[in-house]
A protein has these predicted regions:
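Acidic, surface-exposed loops and disordered segments
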Residues: 1-170
Length: 170
């Protein structure tokens, strides 16, 4: 698939089959993430693969809404950074997250970005602290996102180019 078709086909997928993601697919996803651009080539990003069902279920509760899809995903990739490497860690992690999403589509997998940074629960707990606790992530790391990944349970139509917001181009 060429790039134009890839970005048109890529959609957020929130329902998955029970089919596992293969080790080869996982490696391709991580390879793409590790090739993402980073500020001054410092690569402040780090990744954690989560396949454990109990951990995925716990991660699905890190916010009050919008995270339940993690419980049914075959896996998730947590995208985080060591902010002591660069103050541009958010941008580095966002690039890596986007590369994971595009690679997933290229592999025929479904994926959805789950925002962690600056999100939380109504009781005041931050999503980031919950994720760090579940996965024993170092306290000084910052978690930007998680990507829920699996085989698509329901296909989605490609992006409709007629709905592009060209008036947003100034």
């Amino acid at each position: 698939m060429d790039f134009k078709d890839l970005i048109k086909q890529r959609r957020s997928i929130r329902t998955f089959t029970s089919e596992p993601v293969t080790p080869e697919e996982e490696r391709a996803l991580l390879r793409a993430a590790l090739m993402a651009p980073s500020s001054k080539g410092k690569h402040s990003y780090f990744f954690k693969v989560v396949r454990d069902r109990e951990q995925l279920a716990a991660l699905s509760q890190c916010r009050d809404a919008g995270t339940q899809l993690l419980a049914d995903a075959a896996m998730a990739i947590v995208v985080m950074a060591d902010p002591s490497i660069t103050d541009i860690w958010v941008e580095d992690c966002a690039s890596a997250t986007s590369y994971i999403l595009l690679q997933a589509e290229d592999l025929g997998l479904g994926a959805c970005w789950v925002q962690v940074h600056s999100r939380g629960k109504e009781d005041g707990r931050s999503a980031q602290e919950i994720v760090k606790d579940v996965l024993s992530i170092p306290a000084d790391y910052q978690v930007l996102s998680m990507v829920a990944i699996g085989h698509k349970a329901v296909p989605r139509n490609p992006q409709n180019e007629d709905k592009l917001l060209w008036d947003h181009v100034l």
